[in-house]
């Protein structure tokens, strides 16, 4: 039989067959870019547009919240050498044995939701760091000072502003790609 032109289901199926689908990895990458851009916007609402103030806000959130991540990692037996690796290994919570997870939550006095949110925020903040700051702060044995080491790393405000713009643009582009 001929294709009925007014059959909406057939028209829809014919149309979606022309649109390339994303792979699961692409969906995850785009979702992370959207989430990172949204978190940057949230930090920007707190800090304003000054790139150094924005970095200080992100740094303060990260350094203040890091002890919870380190305590949780120790409680579930995750090695603490590199903050980037540690953040990848503690998430998702479902990857940890239920008894170890329950014990860690009791030790920390946290709910699953609060801990998941804390871990998610630390991952986002670490991802927001400029590459030089991320590399500087990656070793777990390096104490996190109350202020980011701006002078030590020679972090230029214009370069920081460009870094924030790139993250924002990538987040917006990812959002468009996911909704097209």
Segments from the language model and where they lie:
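Transcription initiation cofactors for RNA polymerase, centered on bacterial
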Residues: 1-180
């Amino acid at each position: 039989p001929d294709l009925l032109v007014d059959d909406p289901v057939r028209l829809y199926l014919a149309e979606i067959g022309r649109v390339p689908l994303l792979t699961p990895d692409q969906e995850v990458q785009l979702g992370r870019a959207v989430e990172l851009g949204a978190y940057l916007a949230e930090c920007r609402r707190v800090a304003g547009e000054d790139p150094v103030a924005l970095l200080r806000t992100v740094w303060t959130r990260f350094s203040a919240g890091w002890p919870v991540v380190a305590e949780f990692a120790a409680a579930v037996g995750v090695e603490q050498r590199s903050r980037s690796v540690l953040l990848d290994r503690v998430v998702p919570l479902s990857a940890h044995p239920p008894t170890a997870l329950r014990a860690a939550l009791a030790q920390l006095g946290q709910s699953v939701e609060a801990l998941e949110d804390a871990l998610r925020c630390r991952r986002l903040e670490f991802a927001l760091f400029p590459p030089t700051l991320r590399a500087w702060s990656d070793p777990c044995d390096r104490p996190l000072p109350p202020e980011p080491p701006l002078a030590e790393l020679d972090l230029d405000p214009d370069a920081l502003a460009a870094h924030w713009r790139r993250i924002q643009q990538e987040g917006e582009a990812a959002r468009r790609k996911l909704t097209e």
